[in-house]
Every structure is written in C-alpha cells, then in structure tokens.
Amino acid sequence: MAARKAMVAGNWKMNGSLELVKQMSDAINNVKSNEIDIVLFPPFPLVSAMIASGVSTGTQTVSENTPGAFTGEVDAQLIKELGAQYVLVGHSERRSIYKESNDVVAAKFARAQQVGLTPILCVGESESEQENGKTEQIVAAQIDAVIEKLGVAALKDSVIAYEPVWAIGTGKTASPEQAQSVHKFIRDKIASLNSDLAQGLTILYGGSVNEKNSELLFAQTDIDGGLIGGASLKADSFTAICNSAKGTV
C-alpha cells in the first residue's frame, strides 16, 4: 500500500506577476519539507519562471488534443518539456465558464497522463445541487467519467481535489465535518474498486481555505491537504497553510 503524502497546491487563476513569482518562490523555498508537496499553478506566461525558481509547478488546464490546428490551446507534451509536473483538470471555472463536460475533463486527464504529467482532478457540486442532496451523485459522476474512460488504475498517478462550487471564492467554507464526509465518500467509492489504490490516493480540499481554517480541515482523516485560491497569492498566508499541513498525513 502506497503511503499518502500531504500536498498544498496554489491556483493563481488569472493573477500574478514575475515579481510575485519571486516573492512566492523565496517564501516556499524556506518552508519546503519532505512531509509535504507544495505546488503552484500560475498562468501560462509565468510557468517557465516558476519552474526556474525551483518550485514544483503545474498548469491550470491543458488541451485534450494532440498538436494540431487548435488556436490558443497548449499541448500536454509542451507543458511536460517546459518542466511542469502537474495539471489541473475539471476546475469548476473551466466546467462552468468554458462548458467543459465530464467527458472533456476525462480526455484532458488522459492526455496529461499520456505524456507523464500528474493530473489533479477537480470535483464538486454547486450550491443548488448541495441543497438538493445531490453532492455524492455529482461527485461520483465526475469521477466515474475518468474511471469509465481509463479504468480505476489511472487514479493511481493522480490527485483528486474536492472543491464545493459554493465555497470557491465566496468566503463560505464547508465545515471540517462536511468536507471529511465527502472525502470519505470519494475514498470509499474508489476503495470499492481498488482498496490499496484508494488508501494511497491524495485527496485535497479546496474552497476558501485560509490560514485560519486550514489546520482543522487538514486534521480530518481523509483530507490530505488543500487546493488554495486567493490565499496562494499572499506569501504569509500560503506558507502558514503549508506549515499547517505538515505532519497531518
């Protein structure tokens, strides 16, 4: 059985600058630890600078296609050649704003793995879905799209991030107990197909995580770290969150 390792990932979305890359990399290099993986996901123009700074780096999306006539898209192989290690797939903003379906997300997941990138599969329900008791149904469908395309074994070389859409950038956060319940559902679902894989799978929580709530969230049995939005743009906040993840897995 593979041992899980805590991870704190920062999604900069369409924010950041070369100066912020320097500030954040200096801060992160001071808190690096064998206990946790720290990864930043800057916008594409900052990826090379982030990699050069020595911080583990990923991209916020990737094309599901191989190279060709796809203006504005970026191929997974090129991302790999730059030296990035991770890619986000299925973030709720990609699903809602750019209408990426579960099938498209699964195709992006597959393309990332094909070239040796580690996909972080983002899953989560909207506020109305949560209010109507559909959280598990929605999350299961998002995971099943990948399993049906690639088989459960593909999840071995991936990370899952549970981000309830109603908590992203809203200041609302799932309680530690709410988040743990969904994380346990995800792990149990995968364990029903492959127990060892499920126990070794890193599952992150995202949704208005900050230095004040991260410790309680990360203390939950099935929460292995966080996918951080706004707080990943502030060195003090992000490093405090990273420190709170040490020793929790």
Swiss-Prot record:
One cellular-component annotation, GO: cytosol
Pathway annotation: Carbohydrate biosynthesis; gluconeogenesis; Carbohydrate degradation; glycolysis; D-glyceraldehyde 3-phosphate from glycerone phosphate: step 1/1
Protein family per UniProt: Belongs to the triosephosphate isomerase family.
Catalytic activity, reaction form: D-glyceraldehyde 3-phosphate = dihydroxyacetone phosphate
UniProt xrefs under Pfam families: TIM
NCBIfam families membership: tim
Lineage: Bacteria, Pseudomonadati, Pseudomonadota, Gammaproteobacteria, Alteromonadales
Disulfide bridge positions per record: none
Gene Ontology MF terms: triose-phosphate isomerase activity
EC primary class: isomerase
InterPro entries: Aldolase_TIM, TIM_sf, TrioseP_Isoase_bac/euk, Triosephosphate_isomerase, Triosephosphate_isomerase_AS
Species this protein is from: Pseudoalteromonas translucida (strain TAC 125)
Function text: Involved in the gluconeogenesis. Catalyzes stereospecifically the conversion of dihydroxyacetone phosphate (DHAP) to D-glyceraldehyde-3-phosphate (G3P).
Residues noted as binding substrate in the record, renumbered to the chain: 11-13, 169, 208, 229-230
EC assignment: 5.3.1.1
Name assigned to this protein: Triosephosphate isomerase
Matches recorded under HAMAP family: TIM_B
GO biological process: gluconeogenesis; glyceraldehyde-3-phosphate biosynthetic process; glycerol catabolic process; glycolytic process
Subunit structure: Homodimer.
